[in-house]
């Protein structure tokens, strides 16, 4: 019995003596592992940089700032750009052209359509939606309309660009007040816009179609000024309806159908009773506006020009709005005076 107790005590003492040794060995092992890991990290940083440097030297990229180096660098850059451009369905066909795949065109239509509905004041949305809905067969039909007319053929051949410098605004300001040129100039000043505010075409693939759509876009303000319609939502809808009836532009038709939904009741009533009937009737009966060389008609009497084109201006929208505002103010004052009694 005594011997068994002694052996247990001896075993316990041995384990107690061995534990510090084991703990010390474990600490030494952990310390060694830490130093080894640190050494490997530092070594990889040093030798990794050396390897990169060696690769650069082997490729002739260090201490070789010669024409050959620049040529190789440019070639590498062009290869990278080529891999990006190869994803396009075609090469750009005119300045500023951005070719899109079919799914990209569909996305452009959906996204720009949603944005245009909720933010019609943002011109970028309207521009993108216009090009997304400008289908090739519609633009080709407009091209045939232009080719069937002598002036239209000349416009296609000469490809005029409606800009401030080409119109000579200073000259327009000095024209007689009955001329179309002065009418256009005074309308621009009244509305605070210029011919340079029209965005270039980007997403239409055919160069002729792109020019036709640009021409339609740049001539938009001529229609405004000829009919003295202001740049407010009612005036824009009226001009869009005129364009849709005359040229069949889908974007113009969409604007005519959807934009009135955001109007107030009085505005919508005015539009449906006066301006939409006028726009549709005038657009269907007047000369194709895409065939009008507006730049050559600036010195013409504005009333004679309207008569030649078959256009009769609508009632003055500014005057109607002003009269309604005055009437509302009168009723408001009358109501307030009645409340004070």
Curated annotation (Swiss-Prot):
Catalytic activity: a 4-hydroxy-3-methoxy-5-(all-trans-polyprenyl)benzoate + H(+) = a 2-methoxy-6-(all-trans-polyprenyl)phenol + CO2
GO biological process: ubiquinone biosynthetic process
GO cellular component: extrinsic component of mitochondrial inner membrane
Essential cofactor(s): Zn(2+)
Binding residues for Zn(2+): 220-221, 224, 236
Membrane topology term: Peripheral membrane protein
Enzyme class (EC, first level): lyase
EC number of this enzyme: 4.1.1.130
Subcellular location as annotated: Mitochondrion inner membrane
Alphabetic keyword roster: Lyase, Membrane, Metal-binding, Mitochondrion, Mitochondrion inner membrane, Transit peptide, Ubiquinone biosynthesis, Zinc
Presequence extent in this chain: 1-16
Pathway: Cofactor biosynthesis; ubiquinone biosynthesis
Task of the protein: Lyase that catalyzes the C1-decarboxylation of 4-hydroxy-3-methoxy-5-(all-trans-polyprenyl)benzoic acid into 2-methoxy-6-(all-trans-polyprenyl)phenol during ubiquinone biosynthesis.
Similarity comment text for this entry: Belongs to the COQ4 family.
Subunit structure: Component of a multi-subunit COQ enzyme complex, composed of at least COQ3, COQ4, COQ5, COQ6, COQ7 and COQ9.
Matches recorded under HAMAP family: Coq4
Protein name: Ubiquinone biosynthesis protein COQ4, mitochondrial
